[in-house]
Amino acid sequence: MTIVNKDSQSAIEQKKKKRTTLTFIVGVCLLFISVYLNLAIGSSKIQFNDILSYVTGHTNTKATFLIHNVRMPRMLAGLIIGGALAIAGLLMQAITKNPLASPQIFGVNAGASFVIVLITVLIPSLGSYSTILAIIGAFLGGFTVYTLSGSTKSITPIKLALAGMAIHLFFSSMTQGIIILNEDSNDTVMFWLVGSLAGIKWQQIIFILPFLLLAIFVTIFMGRQLTILELGDDIARGLGQRTEIVRMIVGILVVVLAGVSVSIAGPIGFVGLIVPHILRKIIGSDN
């Protein structure tokens, strides 16, 4: 019986490895196709030879100029921000044990949006510092949620979710109030609130890339801790985990990732919610 169980377990593990490998290969292929379509399709269609010339650096034509200054930054920003929001959503779902959790439930997106809209309306000259302001707003939302959830030892996933939803609604209401009272700034503010990757510059890419790399490193490093945490606080504490510290570290990481993403692309919440579920469906639930 033991031998049969071991063989069955080994077969399941081999099947999981094959599925993960196949998923990775298909994902990479789809990524390359998406990158090509993003660079080639637009108001001016760019041929494959022009894209290849840009990659190899052999020519300096109008097409390569368009790729380098417009489409490549936009494409990279989409990849980085999508990855950042997906990781933020995964981390939120892990620490709250709520399958519907995303940076929005932590009050992060709403806090970042509120600060940016407020500064855009009152002090437009500070618009160049939107990324820093968004991070400050995200920390404001996250810290408020953390404070309302109770003391460090009394924080529970339910308290965190309820406090996050309350703060999200509060900041969203404040943002809408600012828009209503300042009609002159409506066009600029509404364009940003809708979300867009238009006009992304290389400087912004260079600024946000380290945050994604840090998030990937920390997520991989804490993967086992997050898996243990999903078993429940009592079991995690019984295994020697300091659940409060883990949640605090993950919460700070979520705040930074969401704040940076919101400052560049606007308050996008769906990516952080749906991507973790897609990946769990394909490769399993182990963090």
PLM features: what roles do these ranges have?
Residues M1-N287:
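Alpha-helical transmembrane segments in inner-membrane proteins
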